[in-house]
A protein has these predicted regions:
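Residue-level recognition of alpha-helix initiation/capping sites
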Residues: 81, 103-105, 145
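Glycine-rich phosphate-binding P-loop
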Residues: 157-164
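Charged, amphipathic alpha-helical linker segments immediately N-terminal to NTP-binding catalytic cores
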Residues: 94-97, 101-139
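Structural motif
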Residues: 65-67, 98-99, 162
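Gly/Thr-rich phosphate-binding loop signature of adenosyl cofactor/nucleotide-binding cores
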Residues: 2-91
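Glycine-rich nucleotide phosphate-binding loop and flanking beta-alpha elements
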Residues: 73, 105-106, 160
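Pre-Walker A adenine-sensing motif
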Residues: 142-154
Length: 164
């Protein structure tokens, strides 16, 4: 009987995610590296479009947030005062990090607000849905249950066998 038990990872840090997946996902850190110790607690991605309008009842704050064309277009439609207010409301939720898809330009106040709340911001060349799909797969691997077994591997008639 095995004494090993499957262990599901309860969280990973933003720094771990960035270090392990930056190349595959085309991630580039924007601004300071503060906040890389923040925890990602869910292996899924959120697009905070509805939250930007002020509706936070079901905001998925444990997830990586992604701005695509729709979110950035909405932000560009706001005057400077409203933009700052909306960004302050969003960043005050202390989500793990923000990813800007399509290498889209961002309002300067977005990076300023991220720095104020020490929230890492990344940029990727990938289109939004391709990034979300690839990042979700990467996160599922990071959060997958794992187990450790101690023993020796031997070859018995061409079949690998673990002897505990």
């Amino acid at each position: 009987m095995s004494t090993a038990a499957a262990h599901r990872v309860p969280h990973i840090t933003v720094g771990h995610f960035y270090a392990n997946h930056a190349e595959t996902l085309g991630l580039r850190l924007e601004g300071a590296s503060r906040g890389l110790n923040r925890k990602i607690r869910e292996p899924t991605i959120n697009r905070p479009g509805l939250a930007l309008t002020g509706f936070y009842n079901y905001f998925a704050g444990k997830r990586i947030q992604v701005f695509g064309s729709a979110e950035l277009s909405y932000l560009r439609s706001l005057n400077a005062t409203t933009l700052k207010e909306k960004l302050r409301q969003l960043f005050s939720r202390n989500f793990p990090c923000l990813v800007i898809a399509r290498n889209s330009p961002t309002p300067g106040s977005l990076l300023d607000m991220a720095a104020e709340f020490e929230t890492p911001v990344f940029r990727t060349h990938m289109i939004t849905m391709k990034f979300i799909n690839a990042a979700t797969i990467a996160l599922e691997f990071d959060f997958a249950p794992s187990t450790q077994e101690y023993g020796s591997m031997v070859d018995i008639q061409g079949i690998g066998t673990l002897i505990r």
